[in-house]
Curated annotation (Swiss-Prot):
Listed InterPro entries: Thymidylate_synthase_ThyX, Thymidylate_synthase_ThyX_sf
Domain ThyX residue range list: 17-241
Family of this protein: Belongs to the thymidylate synthase ThyX family.
Catalysed transformations (reactions): dUMP + (6R)-5,10-methylene-5,6,7,8-tetrahydrofolate + NADPH + H(+) = dTMP + (6S)-5,6,7,8-tetrahydrofolate + NADP(+)
SUPFAM superfamilies reported in the protein's UniProt record: Thymidylate synthase-complementing protein Thy1 (SSF69796)
PANTHER family: FLAVIN-DEPENDENT THYMIDYLATE SYNTHASE (PTHR34934:SF1)
Binding positions for dUMP per the UniProt entry: 89-92, 101-105, 173, 200
Sites where the protein binds FAD: 69, 92-94, 101, 189-191, 195
Keywords: FAD, Flavoprotein, Methyltransferase, NADP, Nucleotide biosynthesis, Transferase
EC identifiers of the protein: 2.1.1.148
Protein name: Flavin-dependent thymidylate synthase
Gene: thyX
Transmembrane segments: none
Amino acid sequence: MTDTPADDLKPSFRSDVTVELVKHSAADSDVLWAARVSTAGEQSLDELKKDPERSKGLINYLMRDRHGSPFEHNSMTFFISAPIFVFREFMRHRVGWSYNEESGRYRELEPVFYVPGESRKLVQEGRPGKYVFVEGTQAQQELTGRVMEDSYRQAYEAYQEMLAAGVAREVARAVLPVGLFSSMYATCNARSLMHFLGLRTQHELAKVPSFPQREIEMVGEKMEAEWAKLMPLTYAAFNTNGRVAP
């Protein structure tokens, strides 16, 4: 049986994203004991008690020569709230990632929608594979905001109308746009996160240029900031070696 929809839900609009580190087991020392078991066997356990700063050269060597598996023995879980179109891109990253997302079958979806902020460049110039984004005019910004908000309101009214008529949530949700906010938990390790950051952020130190959509880059930047605090030596080696995942 479908629940009666709440009458007081009014659409709200956001131009930001939420990223929170909710759980972690991640430190530079994790890289060291994982790497040293190759040559030290059981004695690699001694790395658990040592200051990883003394072995930052090893971390840099592993990153530079792309010995990747030692960077997998750690874990970070993030809570993320972002538009559905961001999650469409995010979940293309499958190796080293686990996801659980809010369900539109099991709960009534809240009317929170994405509208680009003033800093979001709106106009694409150039051809596929060679283009840039430039600032939109004031008229384009106003048009984008107005049309998006009107469209979101109409879509959510249709969703509510179907729910009120007894239509199942899993059917009614079909009218909702990809600008609707969803939420999920995403768990990764440092290696899988570095691969994500190499593709989904732009950075002056990157050997291989990437051209991510700005909204997923916003998520990536927040995740990167949290990871940098947990594994500063690994993070420094990542940047020093061109932001290419090992």
